[in-house]
Each structure stands twice: as C-alpha cells, then as structure tokens.
Regions:
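Sec-dependent bacterial lipoprotein signal peptides
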Residues: 1-30
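Short, low-complexity, disordered segments immediately C-terminal to signal peptides
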Residues: 15-23, 32-51
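A short, structured surface patch at a secondary-structure boundary
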Residues: 68, 76-123
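Basic- and aromatic-lined ligand-binding clefts that recognize polyanionic substrates
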Residues: 68-80, 180-238, 243
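Extracytoplasmic ligand-binding site segments that recognize negatively charged/polar headgroups
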Residues: 96-99, 139-141, 157-168, 202-227, ...
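Proline-aspartate-enriched helix->loop->beta-strand connector
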Residues: 128-134, 151, 255, 260-263
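Extracytoplasmic substrate-binding proteins
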Residues: 141-212, 308-327
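Structured C-terminal subdomain patch of bacterial secreted/periplasmic proteins
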Residues: 261-327
C-alpha cells in the first residue's frame, strides 16, 4: 500500500443553540431523517434515497449520493476524505481549533461547525447538509434537532472500531467499494509490517500523550489499541486493561506506567504541548524508562495516535511503527 493519497473530492455534550432553530420547522418539510421521513427534494424532483442502519440500530433514509456532508467527529472527517468526499462542515479535533493536524491540509477550506463537546446547531443549519455524520453522538435531544436539519447517521458504536465506522460511512456516502478497497489495502500493509517486525513481533508497546495536564496513557477500547492489536503487539501494565474514558491520566509518581519495550508518545498541540513534551524528555524520571535507555522511544503526532482516529490515521501509525521498529 503506497503512502495514502485520498481520491478526488466532491463537493458528547449539548451543542450551542441559537435563533437558527426557528428555521428548523421549515427544514423538516424537506429533510429525510428517519425511516418514516419522505425522500429529500432536489430542484423540485424527488431524489433517490437509500435506507441504512446506523451504529445504534436506527434505520435512516439518506440520499443515494450525498453531496453536502457534515462530519461531526474526527473519525467522520477522516473517513469522508478517505472516500473522496469533502464535507461542507466539520467539528474541531480534540485539542484543536480546526481539523486534526494530520488532516489540516485536506480540510483547510471546510468550515468548523462545532467542537468535540458538540455541534453548533446554527452553523450546521448554515452548512445546508443533505446528510449529517454524527460520530458517537448519544444525546437524543441533540440528535432530534439535527434530524430536523438533514438525515443524521450515528457512525460510531460502543467499540469505537474505525473499520466498522468506515464501512458504514462508505454505505452512507455511496462509496462502499472505496471503503472495501481501502480496508483490503490496509490489511495487506499491516500483515506485511507484522512480518517485517521479525524479532520485535509481540513486543510490548506503550502509547502516551503529554500536555499541560500531564501524562496520559491509551488503554484498550480506543483507536490506537485496535491498530496495535492488528500487529500482534502486547500492551504493558494498565494499558492492557479497558479504560473508563478516552485516555487515563497518570501522576508524575506513576510515570513508569508509560514504559514498555517500545514507547510512542505525542501531543495534540504542536505548540505549547510539544514544548512541554520536550521538557519532559529532559527529566530524570523519563530518562530512566527502559524504552528511553534502549533508544526505543519515539515522539509521534498525537492527533494521529492518541485521539479518535480513523482510516488515514491508521495508515500513518503503520508508517511510524515501520520507521521506528523495522531496521
């Protein structure tokens, strides 16, 4: 699998709510947000629709070939761009003002319509979507408001499995073939890397994120753990357990929890947090880690490794691991 180049493009807290909600009654007449909703209207003619089952089991009628997609999670944005569809709205990435750093160039012209904490309904309305990819949004009141704007599909289930989400997004966007092709190429690339790891296959790999709040490790049940599992790696200490949240904070006294045969550590912010990470590397407690002493510690882009993740992020992780571990 060559370095990823996306196909040509076409054009969970309560959200910010404003006077734009007054327009939703009119929008409801032309939106198709559930199995009981009429097909959407385009230039006076009924558009072709298809029914999909989202990550919650809800059946949703969506346009057969959506052209105005709003992506309400990093994984939705990653998937859409991977499949050759440029959204008309996105939510800012974790710790970012806009798209996740690794997608910034591809998404530089896409308006921000919300944050990790939730969508801004007014901005979603202004984007005039014909379908909304709602990520892992679980607030039923928010979902009801979004469904008045356009058909809304929850794309991420409780497992947060990026592969399942990509397949569902491919179905919603009419790009199932592209999704299947990507997953096949990813599988081939992962299998090749696993073979080339040689004696390092089965090593314990630690993944940590550093910020002004301190150090956190990535446990089971998140994106990066699934990618590492594809490669057959072990996880050290508490990282082999399922965490309660997206990441698990550590006190300075427990810094040894980030140790392993190999350590990959990153930050979300390329500015302040990256500077803090550079300072951490100078501390004796960090320098005493086995992975550091063995020169098995690598600084990575935290937006790829330690956030919600997605298809392009997964390929980047494989590339980083190959560069660090295959000699």
């Amino acid at each position: 699998m060559a370095p990823y180049s996306p196909p040509s493009s076409r054009g969970i807290a309560r959200p910010v709510i404003s006077a734009a909600l007054l327009t939703l009654g009119a929008l409801t007449l032309s939106a198709c947000g559930s199995e009981d909703t009429a097909a959407s209207v385009d230039s006076g003619a009924a558009a072709t629709t298809t029914q999909v089952t989202d990550a919650t089991g809800t059946k949703v009628k969506v346009p057969a070939a959506p052209e105005r997609v709003v992506a309400l999670s990093e994984m939705d944005l990653d998937a859409s761009l991977t499949l050759g569809v440029e959204p008309v709205g996105l939510t800012a990435g974790r710790g970012q003002k806009g798209a996740p750093r690794y997608l910034a160039d591809q998404a530089k012209s896409i308006p921000v319509v919300g944050a990790v904490t939730g969508p801004d309904i007014e901005k979603v309305v202004k984007a005039k979507p014909d379908v909304i990819l709602a990520g892992q949004l679980a607030d039923e009141q928010v979902l009801a408001q979004l469904r008045k704007v356009a058909p809304t599909v929850v794309t991420i289930d409780g497992t947060k499995d990026w592969k399942k989400s990509l397949e569902l997004t491919g179905t919603v966007l009419g790009r199932s073939d592209e999704a299947e092709k990507f997953l096949a190429e990813y599988g081939t690339k992962a299998a090749s890397l696993r073979t080339d790891l040689g004696s390092q296959a089965g090593a314990s790999v630690s993944v940590a994120r550093y910020s002004a709040k301190g150090t956190a490790v990535m446990q089971q049940g998140v994106f990066i753990s699934d990618v590492l599992k594809d490669l057959g790696f072990e996880r050290p200490g508490i990282q082999d357990d399922k965490g309660e949240g997206h990441s698990t904070p550590l006190s300075d006294e427990n810094l040894d929890e980030i140790d392993g045969d190999w350590l990959f550590i990153g930050s979300l912010d390329a500015g302040t947090d990256a500077d803090l990470l550079a300072e951490l590397a100078k501390k004796p407690a960090y320098q005493q880690l086995g992975a550091v002493r063995d020169e098995h510690a690598t600084v990575v882009d935290g937006t790829r490794w330690t956030s919600l993740g997605g298809a392009q992020a997964a390929v980047s992780v494989l590339d980083d691991i190959r560069k660090a571990m295959v000699k």
